[in-house]
Each structure stands twice: as structure tokens, then as C-alpha cells.
Amino acid sequence: MAIKTDIRGMIWRYPEPFVVGREKVREFARSIKCDDAACYDEAAAAELGYDSLVAPLTFVSILAKLVQADFFRNVDTGYTTMQMVQVDQGFTFHQPIKAGDVLYARMEIASVNERFGADIVTTRNILTNAGGDIVLEAFTTMMGHEGDDSVNIKWDAESGQVVRTA
């Protein structure tokens, strides 16, 4: 196992709050071709009972990328070169993400395992608001190996799995 198992149980807090901008919500909604009026128009959001624009569900990917990059930049995981693929992810929204929200992110390393020469890491990712309430809980599973591309993986449509080819 190339990854350091002592990261298991680690809690990584993103160092800065993430402020959800109104124009960022609109820009993101346009980029994914979201046609929900509550993402663009405050009156439409108010009709649904919200006090500001509602971000599309996948908006959280913006912050998730920042948190993950910050973690790998600052934590010695044991990898010097790394090939990694995300193999699973699940979300539980406790409340919507809205323009004006101030969010705080933490990533917990829930498990670190080795299977068939690949390191498998599962993270529990929590977003809280300024009041400390949980907004989102997500679990992400990543598979990686250290070294070059001599070990190849590909998507096998027949089995619905990521498989090794060499």
C-alpha cells in the first residue's frame, strides 16, 4: 500500500469559508444548462419559499474541488506521483445551498484500504453553514495507485465497473 494509512480518521478543514455568490449561482446554472427559474430569479425562488437564489445540486462541486486540492497540497499522503479515479459518490442534502450562504467544509478520511494493488480511500465530506448546521453530507470513494500509467484502468460497460487492463 503506497498511501499512508495514518491518514485514516484524519479530519481536514478547509481554511476559509466559502461564500455562495448570487452571480456564481446563475453562472453555474447556465454552465450546466439548468432551466430552474429559482436558480436565476429571486422572485421565482421566493415563490418556492426561499429567501435567495437556490444553487443547482451539483454547485457543491466547486467547493469540493477546492477542498480536495487543498488537502492533497498540504497533507503527505505517501504518494509522490499518483494516478487516481473517483469510483463512487453519494450526497445527502439537509438543506438547499442558496446565494448568500457562508459554508464551512471539512473532509474526514473514513477508510483506507488496499485491494488488488490499488489504494481505496473513502471520505466523508461535511458542509455546515454559519450557524453550524449541516447543509450537506457526502461520501466519496477514490481509487489510486502510485507510479506511472503502466497499470491501466478502463470503464467496462458490460459489468458497469472500472477494471484493470494490465
Indicate where each model-derived feature is located.
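HotDog/MaoC-like acyl-thioester-processing domains
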Residues: 1-4, 88, 93-166
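Hot-dog-fold acyl-thioester-processing enzymes
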Residues: 1-86, 153-166
